[in-house]
Amino acid sequence: MKALGTYIFAGGFTLGVKKHFDVLAHFEEKPGLYKKTAKANFPNLPIYEGEDDWPREKYKNKVDFVYCNPPCAPWSNLGATQKGASAWKKDPRIACWRNSFNLLKELEPSAIAIESVPRVYSKNGGYPMIMELTEEAQKLGYQVTHLLIDGQFTGLNHSRKRFFFIATKYELNPHRLNFAPAPTTGEVLKSFADEYGKDAGHIFKMTESEKPYLKHCKQGESLRTTWERFNPPETWVRGGMRGGVKGRPQFMKWRLSTAKVCPVIAGGFYIHPTEDRLFGHKELAYLAGFPVDYKFEGPPGSIGSQIARGVMPPVAEYVARIVKESI
């Protein structure tokens, strides 16, 4: 069976889909974000950039499954906090959803799956858009499934809740989830060390002002909280465009707990639970279900974002499997 992806970024979605489908091409925006990484790992895969230049006629009636990962930023919790819950309606990136969905009409596949963050299904998020697309898909003769899933129950080594809009010509049976307890961060790191030794890969960087506080940061604690213990509010100095506190660490930098499941990966921000450093990119890839030898092109500091912005391979494999069974 044949598949085609849209907005696949570094290629995590394709890694999972390829276990069940022959992937024909990627359709990307222009310029294609992380195209060099996708090319390094799938050198023979055609990648078409720019929605106006997608060769739709070339692939019409030749694709069984279209899988899509349009940008989720319009529905991120951070964006909603700063810009308001309805800001997504004016975000130009939601066009990526329409470009992907329209391939149902243009390619006539047996199925399509579009992934995003759960807030796209919230009444205060993109729910009206989801229902609009649902009605359109049903009029085209497709059955629609709204799938909310935590990736840890598909074999992923961390918790990652995501929404999938799935339209199929045949009945979909989203079953076979594994609800056994997911491995803890400590167990995953031990497994990584047993398989790959001490080579953690590129260690993500911290600022010099953050490093002195690492030894004081407890498991399960934000480095910002640690910093604030040593720097009471009366000592804070604000500056910059948003009036932030100078020298205070990013809120996303947490020291993980060995006894708990790793939370969602949003970049290379996590602090190792037992060593005073951030994670290495190979450790992060292992947590995310990527091969540790996956080739990430571009600046090393971008690898965390490359991993975080896509669909994790184990989740992609699960979605591809249930879609294939429906076909």
Each language-model region and where it sits:
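Redox-cofactor binding/interface segments in oxidoreductases and associated redox assembly factors
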Residues: 67-68, 114, 267
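S-adenosyl-L-methionine-dependent DNA methyltransferase catalytic core
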Residues: 2-22, 35, 136-140, 162-327
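Short, flexible, glycine/charge-rich loop motifs used to bind or transfer phosphoryl groups or to couple energy/partner
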Residues: 54-57, 102, 154-155, 252-255
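Conserved Class I SAM-dependent methyltransferase catalytic core
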Residues: 93-167
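Core alpha/beta nucleotide-donor-binding catalytic domains of modification enzymes
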Residues: 2-108, 118-128
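Short alpha-helical segments and helix-capping/turn motifs at coil-helix boundaries
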Residues: 50-54, 148-152, 248-250
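Proline-centered helix-kink/hinge sites
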Residues: 70-71, 109, 157, 291-292, ...
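Short, solvent-exposed polar/charged micro-motifs at secondary-structure junctions
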Residues: 56-63, 155-159, 307
